Amino acid sequence: MLKKILPVLITLAIVHNTPTAWAAEAPKTDSFYLPKSLDLSPLRLHNIESNPYGKDFNYAQQFKTLDLEAVKKDIKTVLTTSQDWWPADYGNYGPFFIRMAWHGAGTYRIYDGRGGADGGQQRFEPLNSWPDNANLDKARRLLWPIKKKYGAKISWGDLMVLTGNIALESMGFKTLGFAGGREDDWQSDLVYWGAGNKMLSDNRDKNGKLPKPLAATQMGLIYVNPEGPNGKPDPVAAAKDIREAFARMAMNDEETVALIAGGHTFGKAHGAASPEKCLGAAPGEAGLEQQGLGWANKCGSGNGKDTITSGLEGAWTTDPTHFTMQYLSNLYKHEWVLTKSPAGAWQWKPKNAANVVPDATDPTKFHPLMMFTTDIALKVDPEYKKITTRFLENPEEFKMAFARAWFKLTHRDMGPAARYLGDEVPKETFIWQDPLPAANYKMIDSADISELKDKILKTGLSDTKLIKTAWASASTFRGTDFRGGDNGARIRLAPQKDWPVNDPAELHSVLAALMEVQNNFNKDRSDGKKVSLSDLIVLGGNAAIEDAAKKAGYSISIPFTPGRTDASQEETDVSSFAVLEPTADGFRNYYDAKRNTLSPIASLIDRANKLELTVPEMTVLIGGLRVLDVNSGGSKAGVLTNTPGQLNNNFFVNLLDMSTKWTKSPKAEGYFDGYDRKTGKLKWTASSVDLVFGSNPELRAVAEVYASDDAKEKFVHDFTKVWEKVMNLDRFDIKNN
C-alpha cells in the first residue's frame, strides 16, 4: 500500500535515547576505530543462542497445534473493539491492520531476497522507526493480547499477515488463503537500505538510477513517495517510480495496479496537523517511559480526529470499511485537482468537491474525497490506465487479481510451498513459488545409494567436476527468501545452465553423464523405485568428496536423504531465476567486476550470509573447496596444495606458512603472488578472498585452528558437516517434519 510518509523525521538514530556521557563510554565495534575493518557480523546474526525458545524449538510443530479458527475469532473481536488509547477509524481497525501487514511484507526485494514479513522484522529498528511505518507500533500493541494468549504457537510474522487477511475478509473481500510458517527473528537484520541515514532522502545515484539491490525510491519508504518523487506532485514521474519499485519487489504492472487499487479501497490517510509542530520522536529515539512507542502527538487529543501519520489527509471512498469498486470509479468519474492537506502535504481532490466522505470519528461530519499523486499516476500512465479501466469494467477480474496479488505480496518471501503451514493454504500453485513436482515413485534405499555412488564414480567424471556441479546447484540457495538450492535440478534448465560461473560446457558434460546413470537406474524397474537428477547431483558430490577424503587417508560417509524432485522448464520462471545468478562466488574464486558493487571479500560475506553459514563454517568450507580444486574456470588461485583433489588442511597450512611472501600480482587487480622468501621462486597465486583468511585477525584465528597438526581429522569432519548442511538447505520437506 502506497502510504504514509512522515516528513517531520529528518534523521533517525537506531538506538534508545541515551545520555551523551553514557554513549561516549559505551563499548565500540572495530569499525568505530578502524572503519576499513572487515565486518563479520552478518555471519553471527540470528544465532540460536539468541532465541529465548532454545535450540530444540520447532516452530512448525508448534504452529500445527494452533487452533487457527480461535485465533481468527479473537482477531475479529479486536478489529471492532476500539481502544481509548488509540481509537479505531470508523470503529474498525481493519484498514490499519491491512497497512501493518502490507508494510511488513512490502519491504521484500528480488535482488537479494531481503525484507518481507518472515521474521517479523517490522518490530525492530530501523523498520520500526521508518516514517512509512509511522504509528504501526500501535497496531502491533493492539494485537499483543492475542500474541500473549497463543505465545509460541504463532509468530509475530504469521500473526501480522493473518490479521491483514482477516481484516480484508471482515470488510467483504475474499482472500485466496493463508499460509503460516514465518519464524520470528530476535534481532534486527543487517540490510543495506540505502546510502546514509537521512529519512526520505533520494535512494537514486547521481545518474538518477536506483542501485541494486534497493527497491524503495526513498529512504524510509516501503515503495514510493505518495506525494510524488521527492515530494513533487508529478503523476507521470510517480508512475515511473511505481513501476520500478514494484518490479523490484516482484510485481508486474497488473499486480501493482491490483494492490494499489485494492488497498486504497479501505481506510484513510492521516494528516490532521503539521507533523513538525505536533509529533515527537520515532520509537527508536523515544524516551524509555514511552515503552517502545513513538510519534507521540501533543496536538489536540493526540489520536482519533487529531491523528497524524503521513501528513496526507482523507479517504479514497465513501465507504472505507467495505470492499467496493469506488476507488476505481472515483478515480475516473472525477476531475482531480491539486491541493494540500491540513498538514501541508500535496494531494488531490475532485474539482467542485462535495463533502461525501463520513468523518472517521464523528458520523455527523463529512469531507471531500482525496487521492495521492501515486493514485492519479494510475490514470495518466498509458499502461496503468489500460489496466485500471479494464478492472473498472470487470469487477470480478479485479477481485481475483487483487486476491492473487495480495497472496503473493504476503507470501513471496517464504520461498516454496513446502514451507507453508496450516489448513488455509491454497491448492493452486504459482510460478513465483518455484514449484516442484511431487514424487510419484518409491525412494531409493541405502543399498541403492551405495550402488549409485559406485556407478557415478565409474563414469569417468573427476571428483572435481562432480563436486563443482553439486556446489553450483546447491549454492544458489539464499536464506533471505528461501529460494534456490539443488531441489528441482534447475541447474540443467535456463537460465542456470548458461551462467558463466557454472562453466556451461563442462557442466553440460557432467549433467549428461549423471542423466545416463539416472536413466539406466530408472528404466525397466519392477520395484517402483526411481532416482531424481537433483538427488544424483548431490549424491555425486558426496561420493566425490568421500573419494577425495579416501585419497587423503580418511574414511568418511556423508549422510544422504533422498526425496528431491526435478522441475521442468515450464515450472521455472527464467526472469525470476535470473536474479539468483552469482556474479560473485568466493567459494569458487569467481568475481565479475563489471556486475558487482561489493568487493570480492564483501561479496563472500554476503553469499555466506545467504547460505546461513557461521564464520567457522565459511572458513572450513573455503579451505576444503580450494584443495578440491573446484574454482570456476579452472583457476588455480588459492589452490594452496601440491595434492589438488585430496581433502586435507593444506590450504590453511600453506596460507599461514611464513616461508611465503605475498605481493600484489601485476597481472590482475585483486590477485596476489606468493614467493619463497629464500629462493624467490613463485609458489602460489591467490585472490583477495584467499588472503583475507590470513589477513583478518578473526578469520586467521579460525584458520589457525584448522592449520594445526592436531586438527587434520577435525578439518575433514567439519568440512563434510558443513557440506552436508549446504546440500540440504532447501530440504524444507525434512525440516518441517
Curated annotation (Swiss-Prot):
Bifunctional enzyme with both catalase and broad-spectrum peroxidase activity. The keyword rRNA-binding does not apply. Binds 1 heme b (iron(II)-protoporphyrin IX) group per dimer. There is a cross-link at W102-Y223 (Tryptophyl-tyrosyl-methioninium (Trp-Tyr) (with M-249)). Residues 1-23 form the signal peptide. It catalyses: H2O2 + AH2 = A + 2 H2O; 2 H2O2 = O2 + 2 H2O. Homodimer or homotetramer. Its cofactor is heme b. Belongs to the peroxidase family. Peroxidase/catalase subfamily. This is Catalase-peroxidase. InterPro entries: Catalase_peroxidase, Haem_peroxidase, Haem_peroxidase_sf, Peroxidases_AS, Peroxidases_heam-ligand_BS. GO terms for cellular component: cytosol. The record marks R99 as: Transition state stabilizer.
